Amino acid sequence: MRLFRFCRQPLRGLVILIEQFPAFLRLSWVCMAASLLGGAVSERYIWLGSITDLLARGVFAVAWLRLVGLGEMPGRAAYFRLGRREIFTALGWMSAEIFVIFPAQVIAASLAIATGQPFADLVMPLLAIAHALLGAAYLLPTEAALEVGSNARWRLPEMVMKGGVAAGLAVFLAWLPTNLLLEGVKALPVVDLLEGLTLGQMAAVPVRYLGVALTAGAMALVWNALTAEAE
């Protein structure tokens, strides 16, 4: 069925992540260090910490999207390139996360108030549904990262219409293992390792970057498939 035509892309993205794990470490370690630094200062300077983490994830998302989608392989041992593409991709990734997550949280909070059930029990299934139905929003940062040439035309509306829920299901399948890992991280004991950082916060950073790699890899493959369909 065409609804499930992109369900193999998350698995292919996982295989690429496993095969290119040394490249993942090379592309992500500086970005993860920046995110950890942002987390450490966020208690005192919340905006500085949030912006640092946002831009760091944008830098890595561009690198991984272009590695999977275009075959680009930066050769440096440490990678951190911040330019127009990375800023737009970071903003697009944040917008996609808000577009997908915020409605699920609002509905879960409303249901928790109305029914008396715990918010945590309600939000997980709603987040799963939201990723499946609205996950095509991640085509926004994908296009920002994969644009080629100065005359590249804006194809996002066309790609969202063609991808639809099929692209959202790919996002859901890529999001699911990361979410399960983050739930495990939440169960870690609260131990202060550094000033402003607990064990759980430090463990969550590499898990989130794995999640970015899985989602970005799946969406790069979906974008290439949609581009091939359009030609």
Model-derived regions, located:
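Hydrophobic alpha-helical membrane segments
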Residues: 1-231
